[in-house]
């Protein structure tokens, strides 16, 4: 290879990242127009397009590099010099942290995810002293109640870039003040002020104002979801001011926000104060930088692994028919490997399973489907693996494992947020907690269905409970679009003997689903059955599901709220908005 080629390659990779992030910002900047035009299908398409941008631009750079090197192989020393040149380009680069992840992605694509060592990749950042440093560019604006909170909030709302008419701005302001007074008290509120992010956060059918409520006793989140009426007028649906509420809004089971962030590290650092329970990876994920979030997630895993004496074990819960799931006992993630062979009743391929996981990545997760990070050639030290798990891995996934002596390499796996399996949770709770869990489960099914997702396998074991008590779906191998399912009523038996027969007396075609059958496995527990019948009996009716299908086919996009219905101003304060 000619000398000087290393610098050209480094510059080409960085220019490729510039192009990718420029397109990322371009798609993001269209969020306001899509919101104002109530073009909800364009919102969904833009979300998918933005996710695809990263891999598309990695592919473009890889093709450029193959042309530059004329397809010649490169030795280890050459690659190290490329990384050295790339590192020298980063000290004055504003998005250096994501540029490092882009370099990693290009390397992995070029070398088929092999030889992934700290010398060749940015396993940890090359600029640790710059990470999360305060950046001078102001991200937010302060508002003080010099003339009272009504005047303050009028200024905040008037500062918004939205061009639509407000349904009743004065009413919304009084609702917010009423909520803040109930939360803080009159005296504390008088001594508090707001800091509001310059950019709105767009997701689904809402534009979120995100701010900080700075009080004498500390800083609280200040979140206002802005929606539209059917007539295209704006209204504020609620005001959220607790870290738990904010954590759910920015949760791992929700779609990524569209927020214009030329300096994502600065925004992540600004958000950290109101989302103290979120990791760096989760914050990058929330603002749509999912590939860099994967880098940060892997770093968090390495840091945890270095500081613990634990071994990987099989994850608690009923063993899956398709996925082998393991975890570290104290770590908040699980690792999922597709088995070599599935249970006989699972008539599908590994490629189908991967396609299902990709569908979830790109689809609106409505707060009910866990996000995942996908890894190839994942290295584990054998000393970190319990003997029982090692035996299970070799028994169930041997084709995906390469033995390197003191290490194994797993060819492909997913990492996902760890939750308590719902079936285990239901065994452990009673009273109101049991009722809440069943209500949450039914709501999860409804919200998934309204978003055109049918879970397929609705058993409790395929759902998890988050630390906030939300029920989230996490087993995707049978997932499909609602519009692909044929929901049928079970025909009446022809003869009394039909109901005793081992085979159904009616024909069943691929894609047929009989909601009446859900009762058999969802209501078998006498503690659960009556609750389910009380709250979710309509889920057992085929006409309920067909009505949802009709709404989807007519192009209707349902509202998705990241908070309880009872928190809506229209419910709390009695005035209906429509």
Curated annotation (Swiss-Prot):
Q: E.C. number, please?
A: 2.7.11.5, 3.1.3.-
Any idea which UniProt keywords this protein has? ATP-binding, Cytoplasm, Glyoxylate bypass, Hydrolase, Kinase, Nucleotide-binding, Protein phosphatase, Serine/threonine-protein kinase, Transferase, Tricarboxylic acid cycle
Tell me the residue numbers annotated for binding ATP.
315-321, 336
Residue ranges of the TM segments: none
**Where does it reside?**
Cytoplasm
Q: Which reaction does it catalyse?
A: L-seryl-[isocitrate dehydrogenase] + ATP = O-phospho-L-seryl-[isocitrate dehydrogenase] + ADP + H(+)
Query: Could you give a GO molecular-function term held by this entry?
Result: phosphoprotein phosphatase activity
Q: Which residues form the active site?
A: 371
One Pfam family name from the record?
AceK_regulatory
Q: Which GO terms describe its biological process?
A: glucose metabolic process; glyoxylate cycle; tricarboxylic acid cycle
User: Briefly, what is this protein's role?
Assistant: Bifunctional enzyme which can phosphorylate or dephosphorylate isocitrate dehydrogenase (IDH) on a specific serine residue. This is a regulatory mechanism which enables bacteria to bypass the Krebs cycle via the glyoxylate shunt in response to the source of carbon. When bacteria are grown on glucose, IDH is fully active and unphosphorylated, but when grown on acetate or ethanol, the activity of IDH declines drastically concomitant with its phosphorylation.
Family label = Belongs to the AceK family.
Protein name as annotated: Isocitrate dehydrogenase kinase/phosphatase
Look up and give the organism this protein is from: Escherichia coli O139:H28 (strain E24377A / ETEC)
